[in-house]
């Protein structure tokens, strides 16, 4: 084969092997592969590495993506159980983790995932010390905190997918109620990616028209149009419903992760609702990870948007922080 290659090509300089647009995805389950596929399909990376502990499935997923490369912009797809393959990654996306067993407490699930992360995070940092780490595994807020502690990286380079998808679901449901495009609805879900998330009704607007000014009790118990029940509750329940119907969620989170990756590679400075260390914001004084709107660039997070929340929204955010802090404090690192 080498002689044939020499007959085809005349080398004038050695090829560059290291990549400046490299993404690693850890975990090749439904979510991990949805992330990998979305990144590949949107031509965001020139090298995509997959890592998992199940060698056969890992190889199969790699081959399946490789066989589609003729239909995309060129991207090198690699896979291995050895983390050395991840060296030089600009972004590491962590989707691996244990699933909740029937009757298992949340803290028990978190602790099992902590043990898994102990084998993942130090390896990623070892081979890519300048990387940004995006945590997708659930419970995402607590595991992002765990990742920050295990990695030793500055807090701006460790963040979770958080309520970015929740915010997208929120806008979609608002768009259905208002009969306009989701991209024309502006609204945010902050706090925990989970049951204690907070819908920022005070900021929901269409073309600068704030719904809260038109209907001051929107989202509150006195709201006779039941916006909270019809919109926010559906946001919280939607993942449970999808899991009940098809067994897992994958495509929407994959698209969300691809959009975040695009923000890093293009240094677009878009605002996303990502899980970050919220100490010092909205009166929270502990190292707890929750989602707030943040500005994302090529080196990670640069700013937190200082939303003007109502007293009720701040209190709900504090309740969310308290619930997550209790879980964090129970973790054995």
From Swiss-Prot:
InterPro entries, per the entry: L-lactate/malate_DH (IPR001557), L-lactate_DH (IPR011304), L-lactate_DH_AS (IPR018177), Lactate/malate_DH_C (IPR022383), Lactate/malate_DH_N (IPR001236), Lactate_DH/Glyco_Ohase_4_C (IPR015955), NAD(P)-bd_dom_sf (IPR036291)
PROSITE patterns assigned: L_LDH
Enzyme class (EC, first level): oxidoreductase
Subcellular location: Cytoplasm
Reactions the enzyme catalyzes: (S)-lactate + NAD(+) = pyruvate + NADH + H(+)
Binding site for NAD(+): 29-57, 99, 138
Residues the entry annotates as binding substrate: 106, 138, 169, 249
GO molecular function: L-lactate dehydrogenase activity
Gene3D superfamilies tied to this protein: Lactate dehydrogenase/glycoside hydrolase, family 4, C-terminal, NAD(P)-binding Rossmann-like Domain
GO cellular component: mitochondrion
GO biological process: lactate metabolic process; pyruvate metabolic process
Oligomer status and interactors: Homotetramer.
Name used for this protein in its record: L-lactate dehydrogenase
Lineage, highest ranks first: Eukaryota, Metazoa, Ecdysozoa, Nematoda, Chromadorea
């Amino acid at each position: 084969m080498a002689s044939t290659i020499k007959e085809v090509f005349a080398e004038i300089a050695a090829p560059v092997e290291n990549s400046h647009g490299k993404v690693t995805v850890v975990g090749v389950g439904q979510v991990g592969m949805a992330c990998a596929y979305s990144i590949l399909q949107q031509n965001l990376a020139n090298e995509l590495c997959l890592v998992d502990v199940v060698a056969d499935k890992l190889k199969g997923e790699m081959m399946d993506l490789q066989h589609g490369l003729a239909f995309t912009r060129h991207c090198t797809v690699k896979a291995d159980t050895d983390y050395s393959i991840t060296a030089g990654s600009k972004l590491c996306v962590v989707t691996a983790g244990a699933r909740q067993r029937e009757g298992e407490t949340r803290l028990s699930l978190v602790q099992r995932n902590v043990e898994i992360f102990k084998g993942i995070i130090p390896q990623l940092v070892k081979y890519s010390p300048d990387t940004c780490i995006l945590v997708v595994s659930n419970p995402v807020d607590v595991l992002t905190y765990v990742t920050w502690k295990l990695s030793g990286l500055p807090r701006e380079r460790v963040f979770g997918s958080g309520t970015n998808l929740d915010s997208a679901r929120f806008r979609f449901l608002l768009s259905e109620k208002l009969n306009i495009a989701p991209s024309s609805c502006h609204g945010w879900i902050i706090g925990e990616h989970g049951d204690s998330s907070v819908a920022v009704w005070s900021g929901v607007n269409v073309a600068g028209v704030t719904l809260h000014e038109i209907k001051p009790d929107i989202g509150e118990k006195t709201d006779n149009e039941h916006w909270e029940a019809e919109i926010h509750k559906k946001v919280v329940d939607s993942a449970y419903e999808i899991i009940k119907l098809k067994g897992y969620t994958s495509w929407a989170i994959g698209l969300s992760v691809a959009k975040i990756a695009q923000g890093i590679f293009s240094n677009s400075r878009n605002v996303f609702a990502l899980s970050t260390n919220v100490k010092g914001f909205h009166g929270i004084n502990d190292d707890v990870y929750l989602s707030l709107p943040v500005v994302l660039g090529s080196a990670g997070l640069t700013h937190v948007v200082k939303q003007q929340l109502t007293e009720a929204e701040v209190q709900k955010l504090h309740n969310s922080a308290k619930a997550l802090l209790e879980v964090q404090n129970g973790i054995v690192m």
